[in-house]
Structures are given as structure tokens and as C-alpha cells.
Amino acid sequence: QRGQQIFLSRAHPKFMEKLFIQEVPEIYDGLIEIKSSARDPGSRAKICVKAIDTSLDPVGACVGMRGSRVQAVVNELQGEKIDIVNWSEDISVVVSNALSPAEVLKVNIYEDSKKLDVILTEENLSKAIGRRGQNVRLATKLIDYEINIMTDKEESEKRQEEFKDRTENLMKNLEVDETLG
């Protein structure tokens, strides 16, 4: 008969956070706060950090000299790629940082439904989405908003469609022609 069993997991979402607390003295001392993290264990992860002391660079502190601190965490996670994202009060800045290396043109925020439309150029679309949707999936977990990625052309078409619908509604409700609507 066997005794108690202990199951250990390196795939737990908070495991990476604990490794950063161990490797980065500024986090351990409370000068830098981990706001959120998202992992695809064994493949890629994102961690969002904020400096409590504004004189500190939270991303630089987590990376360390020549990447020594982040490399120690990467080695512990068997080569998992880690993106360190600078946190901001402005959610559009955070999502732009989280979707790096893609360059974001515009972010439309829908607070009530916790959704975002991220608008970028056609060239940046695949960078933002990532391999098999990994980049956008991790960014979604990181900021806790549903992210809808669209090109500037798609956004323009969506706006035109919304305008057309509103105009038709106005015309129908007020019983006026198109020039007044």
C-alpha cells in the first residue's frame, strides 16, 4: 500500500511569476509589481510588470544585465519564450505592448463588454495574431479583454456599414429621405 502522493506541475500559470519573484530582487522587495501573466507552457509566455518606484524600468529590471535574469527563468522553464510587457493605466497602451512586435494603429475599447478592436496594417496582421493565434491568445489572457484584430481596411468597412445602418434606422424612424438622414 502506498502513502500520500504529491503531484508537482511546472505548467501552473503562477509558476513563472514565482520564478520572477525569486530572480528579480526588485519584485521580491515590492518595487516592481507583477500585474498579470499568461502562459502556453513549454512554448511561450507573457508577463505584465509595473514599477511602483517610477525611477525604475520594470522591463529592464526583469531582463537584467545582458538578459541574465530573464534567461534564468527561461532556463528553468526549459526554453519557454517570455515577453515582458510594461503595464500602463491605459489599456490601449498595454494591448499595444502585449501584441509586440506588431505595430498597432488604433484600439477601440468597449468597456461594458470587456472587448477591444485592435486595428493594424495588413503587414502587421500575422505578427499580431502569432503562430496558430498564440500571440493574440496570450495577450487576451494577459489583459483580460477579448481582443478582435482587424486591418485598417476591415475597420473602415465596418464603420461604413455601421453608418449605413444608422442612417437607414434614422430614415425609417423619422420618415425622412436619405439627404436629411
Tell me what each language-model feature is.
Residues Q1-G181:
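RNA-contacting regions in translation and RNA-metabolism proteins
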